Regions:
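Accessory nucleic acid-recognition modules appended to NTPase machines
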Residues: 2-145
Length: 145
């Protein structure tokens, strides 16, 4: 985020700037482009993916959890929302290379943030899950090369 250099590293303006960028990407790019009606569901799914960056997860487990919270959502909807975010360059999808046989059919992709500063916008401080953040930074560096 180049503009952050102009803010002289004051914490609150930086957080506000990151939050505004996050809202712009999610609300303008994803919601409007894909005509999403349940913005709260999208925000929850995006927060889940951001919180579990670099790990595999199943869309069916997300759908089952949301069902236990009295929100009916199909696993395909979860996958579509994540795909829409990837198309808006919020996430990068990485397919696993170690799968064989029928495991290839399962959705076992990992997702990485295009800018881990957006994680700061959603969760605040980054020190709790530093291992996930470092893995994300390494992936982005390898992608850049």
């Amino acid at each position: 985020m180049p503009y952050l250099a102009n803010l002289r590293y004051a914490p609150e303006p930086c957080r506000q700037y990151l939050h505004d960028i996050y809202n712009s990407v999610v609300l303008n790019d994803v919601v409007r482009r894909n005509k999403i009606r349940d913005v709260d569901l999208l925000a929850r799914i995006v927060a889940y993916v951001i919180g579990n960056i670099g790990t595999t997860f199943a869309s069916t487990s997300i759908a089952k959890f949301l069902k236990s919270e009295h929100r009916t959502v199909a696993p395909e909807t979860v996958l579509n929302y994540i795909k829409y975010c990837a198309e808006a360059y919020l996430f990068y999808q990485v397919n696993r290379e170690d799968l064989q046989g029928k495991q290839i059919l399962a959705t076992n992709e990992k997702y990485y943030m295009a800018d881990h500063g957006l994680r700061e916008a959603v969760f605040g401080g980054n020190m709790k899950d530093i291992n996930l953040i470092l893995e994300n930074i390494v992936y982005m560096e390898l992608l850049r090369r």
